[in-house]
């Protein structure tokens, strides 16, 4: 009888480990998409940005993206998508920002879209993509103020990046404070209240697979290094990143900072959900910090003929 109990116990443990391995593959496996073949109707040019050499062999692979030029003095905004997505996710934001004179750069993070990569690393290698993209904007548009908007993984990559210059404005949407909470929330959501019990095994496997300590993937440990005006956005119904977690991030960030908790918002495209209010809040924040010389938000209408760097 004891023999069968031991066999059953080992079988259960083996199933748990196999399940954790499967989830690890699901979470960290690459998500390539032939983005350039899509018809977007958006006047952007394809760009390949030289990567920054890191610890992994593919860290210096070029970052693929779309660049849409704005009006001179209007500012440039980097747009960074969420996990298992690509630059197309940020198109609606790019359209309204570009319509108000902002230049925009939409990128595919490594192992997403058309940017090469073997595994998603939850901000570690992705932060190098952000650094390379910000350097590209700084080098090519030296007279422009530069801001960044990131969603979920994209937000974490912005926080974990170490750009060589100060950003003028940063907007972070639906960002987890720690990788542990991100994993536990998702396990609870999909496997019920006992799901988080798998978290230690899953995090250990991820750490082994990626060669990265989980402690390196905690935005809350680095958000105070973000020396830029900050707007944090989250939804009241977000079960992936809870309101209390966003409030902790807000407390850890340095001034100047603002927070917008969207009633009814979940872990999805906040622009699609909040629509005009989202656009008004984003433009108000960016205009205040990237266009102090402007008395009103009329730059797109007044400078439509003054497209720069043609």
How should each PLM-predicted stretch be described?
Residues 160-212, 221, 228, 261:
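Hydrolase active-site cap/lid region
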Residues 265-279:
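Catalytic histidine-centered segment of alpha/beta-hydrolase-like enzymes
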Residues 89, 120-141:
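Alpha/beta-hydrolase active-site loop
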Residues 94-116:
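Conserved alpha/beta-hydrolase
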Residues 250-268:
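Catalytic histidine neighborhood in serine/cysteine hydrolases
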Residues 2-55, 66:
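An N-terminal hydrophobic leader/cap segment in hydrolases
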Residues 225-227, 232-234, 238:
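Short beta-strand/loop motif that positions the catalytic acidic residue
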């Amino acid at each position: 009888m004891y023999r069968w109990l031991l066999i059953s116990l080992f079988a259960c443990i083996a199933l748990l480990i196999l399940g954790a391995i499967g989830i690890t593959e699901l979470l960290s496996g690459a998500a390539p998409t032939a983005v350039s073949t899509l018809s977007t109707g958006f006047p952007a040019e394809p760009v390949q940005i030289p990567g920054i050499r890191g610890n992994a062999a593919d860290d210096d692979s070029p970052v693929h993206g779309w660049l849409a030029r704005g009006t001179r003095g209007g500012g440039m905004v980097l747009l960074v998508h969420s996990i298992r997505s690509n630059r197309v996710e940020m198109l609606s934001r790019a359209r309204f920002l570009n319509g108000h004179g902002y230049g925009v750069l939409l990128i595919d993070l490594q192992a997403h879209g058309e940017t090469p990569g073997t595994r998603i690393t939850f901000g570690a290698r992705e932060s190098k993509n952000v650094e390379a993209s910000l350097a590209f904007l700084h080098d090519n548009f030296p007279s422009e103020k530069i801001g960044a908007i990131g969603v979920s993984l994209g937000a974490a990559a912005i926080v974990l990046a170490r750009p060589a210059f100060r950003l003028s404005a940063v907007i972070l949407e639906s960002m987890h404070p720690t990788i542990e909470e991100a994993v536990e929330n998702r396990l609870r959501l999909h496997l019920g209240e006992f799901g988080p019990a798998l978290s230690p095994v899953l995090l250990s496997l991820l750490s082994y697979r990626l060669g990265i300590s989980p402690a390196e993937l905690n935005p809350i440990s680095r958000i105070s290094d973000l020396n830029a005006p900050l707007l944090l956005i989250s939804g009241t119904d977000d079960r992936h990143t809870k309101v209390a977690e966003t409030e902790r991030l807000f407390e850890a960030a340095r001034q100047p900072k603002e927070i917008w908790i969207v009633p009814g918002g979940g872990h999805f495209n906040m622009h699609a959900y909040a629509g005009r209010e989202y656009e008004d809040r984003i433009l108000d924040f960016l205009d205040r910090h990237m266009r102090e010389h402007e008395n009103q938000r009329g730059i797109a209408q007044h400078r439509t003929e003054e497209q720069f760097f043609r």
